[in-house]
Amino acid sequence: MKIRKLDVPNYPILSVDLSDEHVKLLFKYIKKANESVHPTMGNQWIHTLEFSGDAVTNRKPTFTNDLMELVDENDEFFNDVIRPVITQYCVMSDLAVEHLVQGDKKPLMQRFWARINTPDEYAPAHYHNGVFSFAAWIQVPTNNEVEQQQDPESSDFVLHYSNIIGLPEKLNVKMHDGAENTMLFFPSRMMHEVHASRTNHNLYRVCVSGDII
């Protein structure tokens, strides 16, 4: 008797290791945004973050919104990183990516932003109105192995989906040293959330995200 497993076609979630060059590029964009007048917050946004090298060391009280809009100069990050990932996604997906796309459009980055959070801050479950989304962690101060002895999901990034019989499932991405300088790439309509951490409340997690249409 021979038993074989049949894998059900689905859309993949990709994990990407970012090069040092591209991590530095993202920090450069954050530093430039830190020197710019915010369209709604005004001058109080300028120099609201403090750095040591490429690490965020302080977030001033004037940082009243944890979402910092970024500018991808000459589409450098999109062309060097996102476009090749889209190509690989189309190759690796079990299902036709065309079903995710509305009309015959060339991909472009609709939104591009950074979140600078203390790990005790959280983001409730939500989805984005794009085709693909990504989350790139370039500064991760947490250590899951220690804090998850009390809370097994503490500081996790969680993706929600339904299995083949329609029951809810989730994929937990652990925030530890190995998560730094990695990027997740997934369909925008996937629900996802960020759990709060119980420790490291005076340190900062830096995540750069974007939506592709």
Annotate the PLM regions:
Residues 210-213:
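Double-stranded beta-helix
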Residues 191-207:
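Ligand-binding loop in jelly-roll beta-barrel domains
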Residues 188:
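Active-site segment flanking the S-adenosylmethionine/decSAM binding pocket
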Residues 9-13, 131-133, 205:
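Short hydrophobic/aromatic beta-strand or adjacent loop that forms the aromatic wall/cage
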Residues 102-106, 199-202:
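A short beta-turn/loop motif at secondary-structure boundaries
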Residues 108-185, 195, 207:
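Catalytic core of non-heme Fe(II) oxygenases with the double-stranded beta-helix
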Residues 1-102, 117-123:
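Non-heme Fe(II)/2-oxoglutarate
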Residues 86, 104-111:
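OB-fold ssDNA-binding interfaces and closely related basic DNA-contact patches used
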